[in-house]
Amino acid sequence: MATAAAAKEDVAHRFAKDQLKAIIERIERLEEEKKTISDDIRDVYAEAKGNGFDVKALRTIVRMRKQDANEREEQETILETYMQALGML
C-alpha cells in the first residue's frame, strides 16, 4: 500500500515538475520575443529620427493613441487649463 502511494506521489511530483518546467520555458520564450519586439521598435524610432521626425513627439502620439478618446480629451483639457493658469497660452 505504501508503495502504491509513493508511486502516485512520484507521478504527481513528476507532473508538477514537468508543468513548472513548461511554464518557465514559455515565460523565457515570451521574454525573448518581447526583447526582439523592443529592439524592432527602437529601430523604427531610430529610422524615424534619421528621417527628421521628433522621436519624443512620436512617442507621445503613440501613447495618446492608446488612450480612450474621452480619457485623452480629459487629459488635454486639464493640461490646457494648467497651461492657461501659468500664462503659457
From Swiss-Prot:
It holds the Pfam family GapR_DNA-bd. Coiled coil: none annotated. InterPro entries: GapR-like (IPR018753), GapR-like_DNA-bd (IPR046367). One of its GO terms (molecular function) is DNA binding. Belongs to the UPF0335 family. NCBIfam families: PRK13694.1 (NF010247). HAMAP family: UPF0335. This is UPF0335 protein OCAR_5086/OCA5_c28780. It comes from Afipia carboxidovorans (strain ATCC 49405 / DSM 1227 / KCTC 32145 / OM5) (Oligotropha carboxidovorans).
